[in-house]
Amino acid sequence: MLLADLVDEDPDPDIAATLDVIVAANADILLILGIDYDAEGHALAALTNALAAREISYPHLFSRRPNTGRPTGVDVDGNGRLGEPRDAQGYGRFNGQGGMALLSRLPIETDQIRDFTDFLWADLPESAAPRVLSPDAAQVLRLATVAAWDIPLRRTTGATFHILAFHASPPVFDGPEDRNGWRNADELRFWQLYLDGWSPNGPAFTAENFALMGTLNVDPDRGEGHREVVQTLLDHPALQDPAPRAPDGRLVTTDWDEPTPGNLRVDYILPAATLNVTDSGILWPDSETATPPRSAVAAASDHRLIWVDLEF
C-alpha cells in the first residue's frame, strides 16, 4: 500500500476496496500487514484520514521501520551479487516496503513497547541460522522478516492488553538449504519461547491478557513450511485457537492459485487461553449483495481479514 495511492483523488480500486474491508470489520484493534513504511508516517496518516472520511476513527497508531528492504551488506542468498531484494534483512526492493502498522481505539503504552525487530536470528536458542546461512550472513541477519512487537494497550479499566504482532517469512523462494523455511520456523519458535518465559532482553513476559496475531505463513495441514512448528504454537497452553471460519465454513485465509500454493490458513489471531472468545470469523463474503461485496474483498488483498471478539 503506497502513499501515492492513498492520497490520489481517484484511488486505485484495490485501495478503495481495502478501505471498504476495514470499515466493514470496524475493529477496535487492527493490525495491517503490507503497508509501506515511511519515517514521517505520511502513509499511515493518509490511511487514517481516509478512514476518518468514512467515519471510522483510530486515534492511536504505531509503526516502526521494518526489516523489509533494509540492507545487510552481505550476499545473503549466495548468488554472487550484493544489494538485491533477497540480500536485505527481509525481502524488499526498498526499505519499508510491506511493513506493519497497528491501529487502535485503545491508548498505546508507547514507552512500554518491546520491539524485537533487530534481534539476530543466530541468537535464538537452537537457531537454524548457522546451518543455513554463510558465516557472514549469520553475523548480521535478523530473525524478523518484517517486524516483531509486544505492544501494550491501556483498557478503560486501567489494565493492559498486549498485542504480540509479527509477519513471518514465507517458507519458500529459497534453495535446497530451506533457508526461508527454517527462518519461518524460528520466527514462530521465538514466540513459543517468549510465552514460556524466555526473553531476548529485559524481563520475562508475564501478561495475562494478550493476543498473538499476524501472518504466520504456514498452514498446519498442507502447503510448504515446517507444519509441526505452527501446530506446536497452536497447541501452546498459554494460547487458544478460535479457528475463525468463513461463511462457507472454511478455515483458509488466502485466495491463492490452485493447486499450488492453493488456499491456505496462514493468518492467525491467538488470544490468551484465559480470555473469553465470544465470536470469530473471516471476512469473506459469498455474494455480490453482501457488504462489502465479494469482488471488493477480492480486490483488497489475496489474504482475507480475520477477526476475533473478546470479552474480559
Residue map of PLM features:
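N-terminal, active-site-proximal structural segment of metallo-dependent hydrolase catalytic domains
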Residues: 1-100, 130, 137-140, 156-161, ...
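Metal-dependent phosphoester-hydrolase catalytic domains
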Residues: 107-115, 119, 123, 152-153, ...
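Extended hydrophobic secondary-structure segments that form protein cores and membrane-embedded regions
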Residues: 61-65, 164, 209-215
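Active-site-proximal segments of metal-dependent phosphoesterases and phosphodiesterases across multiple
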Residues: 168-188
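Active-site-proximal beta-strand elements of phosphoester/diester hydrolases
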Residues: 1-5, 114-117, 160-170
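Beta-strand-turn-beta hairpins that frame and shape the catalytic cleft
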Residues: 105-110, 139-169, 312
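Solvent-exposed loop/turn segments at secondary-structure junctions
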Residues: 1, 35-39, 66-71, 108-109, ...
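Active-site catalytic loop in hydrolytic enzyme cores
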Residues: 116-156
